[in-house]
């Protein structure tokens, strides 16, 4: 009975989703090709909400870490996924893996943590997420829920001997497009404070990207693509901070 109810709810949701997209086509003039692309994206999201297949083939082909190599997984949302994409390389020569998925909340990250971090034999993980929770993308977003998800990921990591680095969310600004309506700056600041406190209480390394990218409360315009994502200059600021945090985390393990 419960399964039938769940299936019925999913069907109703899908119908509502399709209806909303069809309405969008009539109201915004989407072409048939654009509509099909959007429907396919929504259908994929319904099939694989947590992105379990996103890195499936890459993970399967990944060799074991070289002897003495400290594999580190950068685990997060679009801030992580976009890192190194334009240049086609991610920390060349370093045993670092990018396992970011754009648009994900920490709830989705938690579901795929085992296959995208633990199963890859990581020595350390940088957990970077929360901005999409604040924007309430796909899951309800509260500071408490983000912390619960980060705690759960940390517990899984510790149980598998993986050092944890908790990263701040990055700032936003309305310098290109409106970002602060969905991601109020005060909420981002509050979440960062909670993440910092959690890291301190738990003996974890806190990686403060936010402080290096912000001017007042705004993302520095020269360091962002659209007020949300860092540009190449922004990632250049973030890279040494991440490297320093990795050294600190791995030193704690020795």
Regions found by a protein language model. Give the residues of each.
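Structural recognition of the beta-strand scaffold that forms the well-ordered cores
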Residues: 71-76, 96-100, 124-129, 164-168, ...
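A short acidic, glycine-rich active-site loop
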Residues: 98-104, 183-188
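Helix C-cap/helix->beta junction micro-motif
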Residues: 159-161, 201-202
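Surface-exposed amphipathic alpha-helices with a cationic face
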Residues: 154-158
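Charged helix-capping and loop-helix junction motifs
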Residues: 142-151, 185-191
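Catalytic His-Asp segment of secreted/periplasmic serine-dependent ester chemistry enzymes
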Residues: 26, 170-254
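N-terminal secretory targeting modules
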Residues: 1-75, 80-81, 85, 90, ...
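Oxyanion-hole/transition-state-stabilizing segment in secreted/luminal serine hydrolases
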Residues: 80-97, 101, 107-147, 170-176
